[in-house]
């Protein structure tokens, strides 16, 4: 570790700020580990925030929504003028109603019906890379795959699919930098309004068309509520998936022995996907606000406190996952990670995400072995999403499929 990185680590362990320039993918794991080893901690950032980082503490907070409320927004600090996102920025009973309206495209039955199409997408996107023997598995595969799945599952137009990634990237940039929603929300709002108008004018039977036609107490859902639901689908539906798949294929590219094992033992593939999610959480943290004074591991957190939940640190807690920094698909409890959340805000897209991972691993196991062609650089997007700049790989020639 460089002197600069060491200084940043020392500073941020006691004054944690996920938007500090010193909090990078290279320093974050060490910072999160040291914070976890200290137990419940407090930082003066943003007027004072509390940090929970042990697995048991984070899971308990996710379970107890009455004490740890989402109703003041889970993204923090919030950009001025930023809308509330559905359903993650709501508590029951409103949260329950929103989830019910959002559930249709992500039920087990709906996802099962999509599986053949998922497999066709994966095969079609990977074929050109394998055919020429090399390519970028992030830009040429993970990103377009995640966006195409989103479009098919929810009924987004080709035009919207082409623009959604840039709109999301712009949003994350300004949330963390200027914290001014006027820099990103009007354009995002216009994109969503265009989609809603399209399906209202020409209903096509898609989930989006059904959502736009929904009524509550005899009246149509307000447009702003629709946009809040759709933006949550658009962002979570492709951003987290893209980053998770990128991490998964990057892991495989560095481990040909694991690739071979997945060919011999296809039953191991789900465990590999879950272990990748545990080891590299796609969304590093969310926040809550306490509704009452609460004692955690002997530390009193006052009512009205902003609490940061460090998912990465919890997923690497040795009390829950022995030797946590080692990628080990045989550990047996990888699926108990918190990368999909827990409790009332448990990820609604979990069935779809797991079906996507299965399709990816199945198709890659039919292709030649592949190796990382050049190093990949990591960066934070909005201080929460750890992303690669690329995953450049080369497929081996003459390898057994």
From Swiss-Prot:
InterPro entries: Cyt_P450, Cyt_P450_B, Cyt_P450_CS, Cyt_P450_sf. Its EC number is 1.14.13.189. Optimum pH is 9.0. It catalyses: 5-methyl-1-naphthoate + NADPH + O2 + H(+) = 3-hydroxy-5-methyl-1-naphthoate + NADP(+) + H2O. GO terms for molecular function: heme binding; iron ion binding; monooxygenase activity; oxidoreductase activity, acting on paired donors, with incorporation or reduction of molecular oxygen. It holds the Pfam family p450. Belongs to the cytochrome P450 family. This is 5-methyl-1-naphthoate 3-hydroxylase.
């Amino acid at each position: 570790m460089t002197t600069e990185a060491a200084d940043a680590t020392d500073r941020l362990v006691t004054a944690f700020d996920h938007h500090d320039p010193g909090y990078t993918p290279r320093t974050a794991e060490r910072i999160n580990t040291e914070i976890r080893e200290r137990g419940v901690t407090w930082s003066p950032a943003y007027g004072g925030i509390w940090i929970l980082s042990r697995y048991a503490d984070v899971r308990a907070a996710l379970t107890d929504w009455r004490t740890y409320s989402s109703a003041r927004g889970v993204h923090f600090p919030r950009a001025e003028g930023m809308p509330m996102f559905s359903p993650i920025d709501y508590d029951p009973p409103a949260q329950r109603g929103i989830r019910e309206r959002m559930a249709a495209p992500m039920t087990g039955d709906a996802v099962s019906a999509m599986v053949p199409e998922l497999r066709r997408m994966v095969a079609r996107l990977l074929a050109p890379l394998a055919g020429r023997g090399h390519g970028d598995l992030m830009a040429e595969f993970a990103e377009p795959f995640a966006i195409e799945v989103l479009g098919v599952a929810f009924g987004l137009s080709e035009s919207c699919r082409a623009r959604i990634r840039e709109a999301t990237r712009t949003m994350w940039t300004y949330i963390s930098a200027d914290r001014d929603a006027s820099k990103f929300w009007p354009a995002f709002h216009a994109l969503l309004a265009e989609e809603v108008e399209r399906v209202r004018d020409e209903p096509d039977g898609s989930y989006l068309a059904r959502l736009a036609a929904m009524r509550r107490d005899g009246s149509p859902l307000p447009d702003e509520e629709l946009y809040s639901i759709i933006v949550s689908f658009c962002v979570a539906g492709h951003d987290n998936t893209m980053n998770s798949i990128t991490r998964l294929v990057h892991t495989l590219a560095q481990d040909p022995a694991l690739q071979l094992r997945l060919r011999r033992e296809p039953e191991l593939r789900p465990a590999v996907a879950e272990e990748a999610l545990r080891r590299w959480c796609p969304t590093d943290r969310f926040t809550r606000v306490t509704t009452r004074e609460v004692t955690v591991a002997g530390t009193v957190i006052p009512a009205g406190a902003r609490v940061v939940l460090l998912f990465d640190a919890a997923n690497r807690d040795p009390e829950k996952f022995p030797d946590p920094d080692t990628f080990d698909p045989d550990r047996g409890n990888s699926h108990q990670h918190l990368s999909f959340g827990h409790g009332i805000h448990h990820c609604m897209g979990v069935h779809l995400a797991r079906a996507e991972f299965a399709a990816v691993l199945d198709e890659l196991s039919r292709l030649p072995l592949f190796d990382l062609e050049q190093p990949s650089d990591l960066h934070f997007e909005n201080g929460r999403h750890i992303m690669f700049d690329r995953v450049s790989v080369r497929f081996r020639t003459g390898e057994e499929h």
